[in-house]
Regions:
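Nucleotidyltransferase catalytic core that binds NTPs
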Residues: 1-182
Length: 182
C-alpha cells in the first residue's frame, strides 16, 4: 500500500482503476463504488488507486471545522479493507483550486496518472469553480483513453446515501439512520 502526496506515480501505479472523491466516512454508497472497482480489479488484473483531497474542498472554502466523518488514518484503514493499492492524498489549497477542469483531465489524469477506468459518483464535480462534471469526463473518454464507470447512486427510501445526508442525520441525532447508511 502506498500513499502519494502528489500525482507523480510510480510506473506500476499508472494505468490503474482510479476512484476520485473525498470518501468521507466510506458509507454504503461509497462501498458500492469500491465493490465495483474490486470486481474490475479481479477481472482486468489492474491496481486500484484513490485520489482524495485534504482538506475536503468544502472545508477549505467555508472554513469549516469538525466537518469530517473520518480522519485520514481511518480513511486509510477503510481503503485497505476495500482492496485499494495506493492513494493520492492531494493537498487542496488556493493553487490547486484554480486548476481548470480541462487541465485536471489533461495535465493530471492523462499526463500523470493515465487511468484505464475512472470511478466517480453522479454528483462528482471538479476543476476551478466546480466546472467539470461526469458529462465532461465521459465526452473526453476516447480522446484520453479512459472509461468512466458511474454506478447508479445507492438510495435509502427516496434519499441518495451521501456524506451530507449522514452529517445532517448526525446533527439531528438520528443515530439509527446514520448506522444504516454506514
Amino acid at each position: 500500500f502506498r500513499i502519494y502526496k502528489n500525482f507523480n506515480l510510480s510506473k506500476k501505479d499508472k494505468e490503474a482503476i482510479i476512484l476520485i472523491g473525498n470518501f468521507d466516512g466510506l458509507h454504503r454508497g461509497h462501498q458500492k463504488l469500491f465493490n465495483k472497482a474490486k470486481n474490475f480489479k479481479k477481472k482486468f488484473k489492474l491496481r486500484v488507486g484513490v485520489i482524495t483531497f485534504d482538506p475536503i474542498p468544502k472545508m477549505f472554502f467555508k472554513k469549516l471545522h469538525n466537518y469530517r466523518l473520518s480522519n485520514f488514518d481511518q480513511k486509510i484503514q477503510l481503503f485497505k479493507k476495500n482492496y485499494v493499492d495506493f492513494i493520492v492524498n492531494q493537498k487542496f489549497d488556493i493553487k490547486f483550486s484554480k486548476i481548470s477542469c480541462f487541465d485536471f483531465i489533461k495535465k493530471i489524469l492523462f499526463n500523470k496518472i493515465k487511468p484505464k477506468y475512472i470511478f466517480v459518483s453522479d454528483n462528482f464535480r471538479f476543476g476551478y469553480k466546480r466546472a467539470g462534471d461526469i458529462k465532461l469526463l465521459k465526452s473526453l473518454e476516447k480522446n484520453y483513453g479512459y472509461k468512466i464507470i458511474n454506478p447508479s447512486p445507492l438510495k435509502s427510501k427516496k434519499f441518495v446515501i451521501s456524506s451530507t445526508l449522514i452529517r445532517k442525520n448526525l446533527e439531528m441525532g438520528n443515530l439509527k439512520k446514520v448506522k444504516k447508511f454506514l
